A protein has these predicted regions:
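Generic structural signal for small/hydrophobic residues in well-ordered secondary structure
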Residues: 30, 47, 64, 89, ...
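PLP-dependent enzyme catalytic core of the Aspartate aminotransferase-like
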Residues: 91, 169, 342-344, 351-361, ...
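Short beta-strand
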Residues: 44-46, 322-327, 365-366
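Conserved core of the PLP fold type I
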Residues: 69, 73-202, 218-232, 239, ...
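N-terminal small-domain helix-loop-helix segment of the aminotransferase-like
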Residues: 2-111, 118, 396-397
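PLP-dependent aminotransferase class I/II
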Residues: 57, 237-328
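Residue-level recognition of strand-loop junctions within catalytic nucleotide-signaling folds
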Residues: 261-262, 292, 335-337, 378-380
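Conserved PLP-binding catalytic core of the aspartate aminotransferase-like
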Residues: 304-305, 320-356, 373, 379
Length: 397
């Protein structure tokens, strides 16, 4: 767990894939430490994985059980996804964007992570550049590295949650092949407006493909998070990715999708066929049922908005701790840079909190944001966990 908060970025800049792969994802390292502590104590609370503590809707479970028992459906092999799910997703995205989405443009995969990796391979395999938000979800960095792409960054303002468009325009260049957006974002929970999306498209101006990761789109707390797919007459090719893991709580079932321009579909189909072959049809039938229960996402959105409010208020009362108010997603980031001791990193601080308060958090250095911690709302004893974290800092000399 030791290491410099900028280690991932430094490994990338040095083009050292081996060193990059040697850097463990702090989230899973903290999960393992929490699991070890749970063997001794029964009061450990994990604020690590963005995996809702609420169960999957019973109708979704029943749909998967029925599909598993039906050999005609459980053995289906479709590299692009079961046709019925592609049609259901097209209807859903048509409603979300207000623009017709053809089922032929929908590519289903085992979660959206595999799609982002394959899109990096497809678009930037020749050493082209992938432009990422900073802070970033580490999947983006690793996907680009595995594709042999180069990485550049644009910044998200930590106070406003808005894109620093000057940094975006400065980072764009003739080698840029792909620009990744994430709204609401992970780890900040920042939300982009339609005006923001339009300004991104104008800045890119057709020079690269814009990939909009909208996995938390239905987890926007205070206002609607618009889809990039709703943009009228975009100048740039647009890919929208989404997943059933968050609001619809199919976290471990691994079903995601992308809506892609027609010219990318054949090549992406080939990549999917050779790197994945197929997505398990059983959870795909669960996903079809999930799209009939969108109220599930609304219920969890309201629950997590309340938890966000409590955490911002309670942690905001602690000297030297600054909650960065999230507008959506499953996560809240807190700035603790001024509370780090000499030689202490956010990783060692997270270990100390786990040891003393029995609350597992994720070091922000994993996301290119050293000096912070990421907390997930997805814990039934969330308020208690926040009180413990606050007490840890209040009692710390």
């Amino acid at each position: 767990m030791r290491g410099n908060g900028d280690m991932l970025a430094r490994c990338w800049e040095e083009r050292d894939l081996g060193a990059l792969l040697a850097q463990r994802f702090g989230m899973f390292a903290m999960e393992e430490l929490a699991e070890e502590l749970e063997r001794k104590y029964d009061d450990v609370i994990r604020l690590t994985l963005g995996q809702s503590e609420l169960p999957v809707h019973p109708d979704i479970t029943e749909a998967m059980v029925a599909a598993a028992r039906d050999p005609r459906r459980s053995r289906l092999v479709y590299p692009l996804g079961v046709p019925a799910l592609r049609e259901a997703v097209a209807d859903y995205e048509t409603q979300a964007s207000g623009r017709h989405v053809d089922p032929a443009s929908v590519v289903v995969s085992a979660g959206s992570s595999t799609l982002i990796r394959n899109l990096c391979c497809l678009l930037a395999h020749d050493g082209g550049e992938v432009l990422l938000p900073r802070p970033y979800y580490p999947l983006y960095l690793y996907s680009a590295a595995l594709a042999g792409a180069r990485v550049n960054f644009y910044d998200i303002d930590l106070v406003t949650g808005c894109i620093d468009f000057a940094s975006l325009r400065e980072a764009l260049n003739g080698d840029t092949r792909m620009v990744i957006l994430n709204s609401p974002g992970n780890p900040l929970g920042n939300r982009l407006t339609m005006a923001d999306l339009r300004q991104v498209d104008e800045a890119v101006d057709g020079r690269a493909v814009i990939v909009s990761d909208e996995i938390y789109r239905n987890m926007s707390f205070d206002d609607v998070a618009p889809s990039m797919g709703a943009l009228n007459d975009p100048r740039s090719p647009i890919v929208v990715t989404n997943s059933f893991s968050a609001g619809l709580r199919m976290f471990a079932r691994r079903v995601g999708y992308a809506v892609v321009p027609g010219e990318l579909t054949p090549a992406l189909t080939t990549l999917q066929a050779h790197t994945l072959l197929t997505t398990d049809p059983v959870p795909q039938y669960g996903a079809i049922e999930a799209l009939r229960h969108l109220e599930e996402a609304e219920a969890i959105r309201m629950l997590y908005a309340g938890r966000r409010d409590y955490a911002v208020k309670r942690l905001g009362e602690v000297a030297g701790v600054r909650p960065i108010r999230a507008e959506g997603s499953f996560y809240l980031t807190i700035d603790v840079a001024s509370r780090l001791g000499d030689g202490e990193s956010d990783r060692t601080l997270a270990e100390s909190i786990l040891s003393a308060a029995h609350v597992a958090t994720v070091p922000g250095s994993d996301f290119g944001l050293p000096g912070t911690l990421r907390l997930t709302y997805a814990a039934s004893r969330f308020d208690e966990a926040i009180d413990r974290v606050a007490a840890f800092f209040e009692e710390r000399v």
